[in-house]
C-alpha cells in the first residue's frame, strides 16, 4: 500500500470533513456483520486486551474508540469487570454492539469529537480506528486521547503496518480511506504526542476471504503522571 490521494485531506470542522465522516460511516454501515466474518480470528487483539485487563483494577473506566460490533474487545472488557463506553461512527455497527454487549454504553461519535473535559478514563483502546484518519489528524487525535486519560492511564492501540495516507481502498464490500505507518514511525508519532510506549508487539495476520494478509502493530502506552 502506498500514499495516493488526489489532494490534501480535509480538516475537522469543515464541510469536507463532515462529508468524509459521512462517507466512512456509510461504508462501515455496509460492512456491518461482514467485518467479523472477514476478520474471524483476532488473537492479537484479544491478547492485547488481556494484557490491558491485567494492568487495570476491576471497575476501571475504559473508552473503546472505534468500537465496531463490540466484538471481541468491549465484551472482553465488560466480562473482566470494566465499565466500557464505545465511540463509533457507524449507526449499524452501534446497533450490533448494543446487541452483542448490552452492558456497555455505545454512542455515535467521531474520534476527533473526543472531549477530554467530559470524562476521564483509566484506559483507552483504539484497535485499528486511528487508521481511518489522515496522517495530519493522528497527532491531534493522540493528544485528545492523552488528555482523556487519567495520569498513569493506559492506551492500547493497533494499526496495520503500511506506508499510506488517507488512501481509498476496497474493503469487505465497501470503500474506505485508510492510513498506515511503518512500526518505527508509528512509535515516534505516539511518543511525540506525549505517551510512553511500554510494549510493542507485531503480528502477521491472515484475514478471511476477501481481505489481503497484513502486518499488525500493537502498542501499549501510558500517560505519565
Segments predicted by a language model, with ranges:
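Short alpha-helix
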Residues: 178-194
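Class I SAM-dependent methyltransferase SAM/SAH-binding core
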Residues: 63, 69-113
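A short glycine-rich, Lys/Arg-flanked "PGG" loop and its adjoining helix->strand segment in the class I
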Residues: 139-151
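Conserved beta-strand signature within the Rossmann-like core of class I S-adenosyl-L-methionine
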Residues: 152-159
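A short acidic, Gly/Pro-enriched loop at the edge of an enzyme's catalytic core
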Residues: 114-124
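Core SAM-dependent methyltransferase catalytic element
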Residues: 206-225
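Short, glycine-/aromatic-enriched active-site segment of Class I SAM-dependent methyltransferases
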Residues: 160-177
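Conserved class I S-adenosyl-L-methionine
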Residues: 2-58, 163
